[in-house]
């Protein structure tokens, strides 16, 4: 089954690679229109997936990731239209020049070929990834989680209908519809056809892909994100950022999980933090130094464990730790962070500069919420993933991250001496 999917995807990638920007944009506009026109089919499938997920005891955070409604589906379609408006990187000449040999040489952006994406209960990923891959002339094989297989299958059928309307093979976007986990292992070995693999899920999935895949893997998306609260902050401004970073969408991988607070402001900041978190419905998990102070406030608070520092809450829960200085804060991030998104709230330029230079994350913020680590927010359009590694891409992966390059040389019957 997967061998045939791989063959078909590779063949489709050759046809996609020579489409003009205008042709790709017309195709994407049709996909966006069909997603809205056929929304009833997708939403009905999603309701079935949601019913099964609730019956199986899925957490509220994961249910939120899984759920689609007309508003979210319209937002997904609008994201596809936004991809149409983005500059096409394919064919762009990165650099080049005339050589002493007489050759005129250039380095030109080209599609990767076939991209494989493994993801969990995120039906929006199906469309986001497909639109970015099509814009860059790549075919894609999608393997969503068993929780979303009906939603994904319905969505891909709509996309394939749009492909056929434009004379593009349906195999340009394929979904592995079976929830059988053995098919994941088979996909990991499909290096004859698949050029890059992107897992979007938990640590277990990332570990499996790194250890078992014969395809180059881009890992990321696990977000144990921190905010360091410096002694020089303005209290109300800091609380506003913290609430946004935690509450706007707690199930997102760029939501904050741990606050590191300069102990010098504990007596004034922790009572205010407790009051605001109680107001927002956010539970706190405190270290031994902050726990007694926080227990005097109205927020729900319990003792934090070492394991909780290492995991994503993806819910209205927030770790709190007092640190003696910025050095201790940076050391904690190095020990427990996932190199996703980390922020400092400060009015001290020296501290901001040091944090930016010493925290080795894919996105580092000064006086801003971690929630901005997103392809759309960064002006990249929909993202295929957020990479926390350093090769071949880092941070939100937009269009350029789905390309590679080739060297093209032009001669005049030129030979090497």
UniProtKB/Swiss-Prot annotation:
Q: Which Gene3D superfamilies match?
A: Aldehyde Dehydrogenase, Chain A, domain 1 (3.40.605.10), Aldehyde Dehydrogenase, Chain A, domain 2 (3.40.309.10)
This entry's Enzyme Commission designation comes to 1.2.1.41
Name the pathway. Answer: Amino-acid biosynthesis; L-proline biosynthesis; L-glutamate 5-semialdehyde from L-glutamate: step 2/2
Q: Which GO terms describe its biological process?
A: L-proline biosynthetic process
Q: Which UniProt keywords apply?
A: Amino-acid biosynthesis, Cytoplasm, NADP, Oxidoreductase, Proline biosynthesis
Molecular function (GO) terms for this protein are: glutamate-5-semialdehyde dehydrogenase activity; NADP binding
Pfam families according to UniProt: Aldedh
Kindly give the InterPro entries that the UniProt entry links to this protein.
Ald_DH/histidinol_DH, Ald_DH_C, Ald_DH_N, Aldehyde_DH_dom, Glu-5-SA_DH, GPR_dom
Q: Where in the cell is it found?
A: Cytoplasm
Q: Record's Gene Ontology CC terms?
A: cytoplasm
- Keyword Transcription tagged: no
Q: What class of enzyme is it?
A: oxidoreductase
Its function, per the record, reads:
Catalyzes the NADPH-dependent reduction of L-glutamate 5-phosphate into L-glutamate 5-semialdehyde and phosphate. The product spontaneously undergoes cyclization to form 1-pyrroline-5-carboxylate.
Note the NCBIfam families from the entry. Answer: PRK00197.1, proA
What is the official name of this protein in its record? Gamma-glutamyl phosphate reductase
Source organism of this protein record? Erwinia tasmaniensis (strain DSM 17950 / CFBP 7177 / CIP 109463 / NCPPB 4357 / Et1/99)
